[in-house]
Amino acid sequence: MLIMGVDPGTAITGYGIVEYAGNRFALVECGCIRTMPGVPPAERLQALYGELVEIIKRHRPEHFAVEEIFFNKNTRTALTVGQARGVTVLAAAQSGLPVFEYTPLQVKQAVAGFGRAGKTQVQYMVKTILALPEVPAPDDVADALAVAICHAHHYTWERKLKLK
């Protein structure tokens, strides 16, 4: 199963594409999409959308996973991240991909085994699970890979439970 995980943001959006087969993970590609500061928000969102669609076309993932937004004390930040998240979901939906959403708690639980794990613990586990020489940088990339790993575990277990 080819999964694309995304950690949306207006300035930096992390993405990761992983192959999951036979209870093993393989990294296909990861990186980040950076938009230009000082550019009008609509243009930044349009650039993000275009880059995501190109990545989806290039790799043709079967599933698209994104983290749900948790309540943020900074309303302005929450709104801009929400806009970027909406654009990522739209890019996936218009590309015909099923979209799966996970809470930060679910992602941490699936990757680190503890829902209150710290960022460093999650990053270390992403590195370990994907057998990478170092933690992916920036943080947004590691977070996107964590979402993809989370989806692989959740989706696999849901399918197993339905077969019983």
Swiss-Prot record:
Example of a GO biological process term: DNA recombination
The name under which this protein is listed is: Crossover junction endodeoxyribonuclease RuvC
Organism, as annotated: Pelotomaculum thermopropionicum (strain DSM 13744 / JCM 10971 / SI)
Spell out the PROSITE patterns in the cross-references. RUVC
> Which positions are catalytic residues?
D7, E67, D140
How does the cofactor bind to this protein, according to its record?
Binds 2 Mg(2+) ion per subunit.
Which segments cross the bilayer?
A: none
Main location as per UniProt: cytoplasm
Q: Which keywords does this Swiss-Prot/TrEMBL entry list?
A: Cytoplasm, DNA damage, DNA recombination, DNA repair, DNA-binding, Endonuclease, Hydrolase, Magnesium, Metal-binding, Nuclease
The UniProt annotation places Mg(2+) 2 binding at E67
One cellular component term (GO) for this entry is: cytoplasm
Q: Which gene encodes it?
A: ruvC
